[in-house]
């Protein structure tokens, strides 16, 4: 795993970051940190939708973060598809639920910023050689 990319993600998530889990990554291609990266992918998808809904004016920041994760990890085939599916699942879950920015949406954003940052730090600390 490329540590530089995770460090960048930690910095981008900003030290502050639900939804239902998407299907698990195929066992024969899974790395030991894939569960964390899958959850991070889902969080990035959720933030991509919710931050835009709440007027953050960040454009495609969270989609770009997902692309940075994919570029750093360079997964192929099923593993790549699973990360993308998790991102899309996070996005769609909130698209179906939130049509305007509410206090609850703001709370979800704060919690996801915290959780995403925590996942990125833990994966980096545990698997960075």
What residue ranges belong to the model's regions?
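N-terminal secretory signal peptides that target proteins for export/translocation
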Residues: 1-2
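Sec-dependent N-terminal signal peptides
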Residues: 5-13
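C-terminal segment of classical bacterial N-terminal signal peptides
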Residues: 13-24
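Generic detector of short alpha-helix boundary/capping microenvironments
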Residues: 14, 32-33, 104
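Immediate post-signal-peptide N-terminus of mature secreted/exported proteins
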Residues: 25-56
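Compact alpha-helical subdomains of small soluble proteins
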Residues: 29, 58-129
């Amino acid at each position: 795993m490329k540590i530089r990319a995770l460090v960048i993600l930690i910095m981008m998530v900003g030290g502050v970051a639900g939804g239902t889990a998407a299907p698990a990554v195929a066992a024969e291609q899974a790395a030991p940190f894939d569960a964390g990266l899958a959850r991070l992918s889902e969080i990035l998808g959720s933030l991509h939708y919710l931050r835009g809904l709440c007027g953050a004016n960040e454009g495609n920041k969270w989609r770009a973060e997902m692309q940075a994760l994919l570029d750093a990890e360079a997964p192929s085939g099923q593993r790549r598809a699973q990360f993308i599916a998790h991102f899309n699942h996070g996005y769609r879950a909130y698209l179906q639920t939130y049509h305007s920015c509410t206090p609850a949406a703001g709370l979800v954003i704060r919690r996801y910023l915290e959780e995403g940052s925590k996942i990125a730090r833990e994966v980096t600390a545990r698997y960075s050689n």
